[in-house]
Amino acid sequence: LTEVAAFLFHTQGGIAMFRHWRADIRAVMERDPAARSTLEVALCYPGFRAVRRHRRAHWLWNHGMKLLARIVSQRTRRRTGIEIHPGATLGEGLFIDHGMGVVIGETAEVGDNVTLYQHVTLGGTGKDVGKRHPTIGNGVVIGAGAMVLGPFRVGDGAKIGAGAVVLKQVPAGATVVGNPGRVVRMF
C-alpha cells in the first residue's frame, strides 16, 4: 500500500499517469464531436474510465501486485463492459468509443493516438506462451466488431474496417477490410 501511495502522490510514475490521463481526455475531446467538456468525459465516458483504471492496474501488475491488478481489471470490466488485461501496454491518447465489448489481451501493445470502437478484440489465437497478442502502431483506427488476432504488428496510421478479422501483419497506412482481412488501400 505504501508503494501505491508513493506512486500516486510522489513519484515519476504518478506524474506519468496524470500526463496519460490528460492525453486520453484530450483524445476524446478531439475525436468525438459529442464530447462537450472534460468533466463530461471524465464522468460519463466508459472508455475513458476503463483506460484510466487500466493504467492503475498496469502499474500494480508491473510492480508484482498481480492479484490486486486483476481485481481492479475485473471490477472495471463489470462496470464498463470493457476488458483490458492489466499486462497490456497502452499508449497515450487512446480513445475507446462506445466501448462495450472491447477486449485487449495480456501481451497486446497499443500505440499513441489509437481509436477503438465497440466490440473490438485484440486477442490471441490459442494457448501459445509469450507474445501472443497484436502490437498496434500509432494513429491506428479499428472499426466496430473487428478482431485482430495474433502476435503481429498493425503499422502506424492503418485503418481496420468494421467486422474485419485480421490474422497477419498490416503495413503502415493500409486499410484492411473483410474476413479474412485484406488490404484494399495503401497511403
Predicted stretch roles:
Residues 1-80:
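Terminal amphipathic alpha-helical/low-complexity segments used for targeting or macromolecular assembly
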Residues 3-32, 95, 111-112, 119, ...:
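Soluble, non-transmembrane catalytic domains of enzymes that act on hydrophobic metabolites at membranes
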Residues 80, 85-86, 91-92, 97-106, ...:
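Left-handed beta-helix
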